[in-house]
Amino acid sequence: MQVAKSDLYINRKEIVMKYTKKTNTWLDEFERNRPLVIAGPCSAETEEQVLKIAHELKNSDVSIYRAGIWKPRTRPGGFEGVGEIGLKWLQKAKAETGLLMAIEVANVTHVKLALEHDIDVLWIGARTTVNPFAVQEIADALRGTKKIILLKNPVNPDLSLWLGGLERLQNAGIEKIGIVHRGFSTYEKTKYRNIPEWQIAIEMQNRFPDLPIIIDPSHITGNRNMIQEVAQEALDLNYDGMMIETHIDPDNAWSDAAQQVTPSALKQILKDLVVRNSDDNTDEYSKSMAKLRANIDALDSTLLDLLGKRMKIAGQIGQVKKDKNVAILQNNRWNEILEKMVKDGDRKGLSEEFVLKLFKAIHQESIEHQEKVFNK
């Protein structure tokens, strides 16, 4: 899947929103020496189920209890949530356990009902983030709220949509904002339900280092056996917390059964996660890192030089094709290159997924260089 360069590399001067330390003060409200944990069922199914899960999570590292009240299903006919009655179950769960409550809101009616039932955390889902009209209506309905508002990444890998959603929330005077990385839809066959596209989330971190970022390994993996792996990757990238779907009987859950874990499994996952230091100020560490980073910088510069030379040759090839009236795209040649590079990459310890992404990007740039020649 090709991602437009404009989606990933928006000029920083175009970003008008400025986040201050106020953005992450809501994290400081939680007394914790480990990442923030949001957990609970994909869907609130029955009052008994909601309360039982909440009580099993009460004495754990979980601070916020999540449950889907309205479910935006891809196709009609599936379970679409219990609706407003579920909010009363969450009120009862909060009263009995002291956990904060979190739900997804997809429209103004959802927001109104959530606020009426004093839900603590509201998140905007991936299918809503893709629609600027919907996000604006929700932002207007939440204007000036003191609730914690989380924005999931859009379904498609479009950085500008994610940024636009943040801008709309910030412009509505909402200060307690965070983002949730839940992966991106793809037609490609991968081990993930939604591919992480870590570089997009990393770019968000680079632009807004004080903005809390939460990983959602349940939706990224779609597989309970991969949740710890992805959660650990996120912690290694300095994420602030995680949202993990948890159910007392995952295999019989009414929605997304394969990606939910039991409360006991969740506790084991959290126990096994390793929280890294964000930095090390010792002289030995600084000297070692300075040397290694200098090597990386030199190699990166060499890479760019080589790519520049490659594109010049691609332009020359384009001229030959133009002179001989030959089409730019030569599928047989392209497939031969991919096959060879995947094999060479494997011998060098590079994954097939990485090699394919790299050379597809290089190929796209080569085509653009040749198109410029054709259009002269």
What residue spans do the PLM features occupy?
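Catalytic beta/alpha-barrel core
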Residues: 82, 99-107, 111, 120-135, ...
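Catalytic alpha/beta core domains of metabolic enzymes, predominantly
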Residues: 30, 134-265, 272, 278-284
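Active-site mouth loops of central-metabolism enzymes
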Residues: 35-52, 76-78, 100-104, 125-126, ...
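N-terminal small/glycine-rich loop or linker at the start of catalytic domains
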Residues: 24-42, 73-76, 205-215
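Domain-level signature for soluble enzymes in the chorismate/prephenate branch of the shikimate pathway
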Residues: 278-376
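Glycine-rich, proline-tolerant flexible connector loops at the mouths of alpha/beta enzymes
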Residues: 66-85, 248-257, 317-328
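N-terminal amphipathic alpha-helix/helix-capping segment at the start of soluble metabolic enzymes
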Residues: 4-38
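Hydrophobic faces of well-ordered beta-strands that scaffold small-molecule active sites
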Residues: 36-41, 63-67, 101-103, 122-124, ...
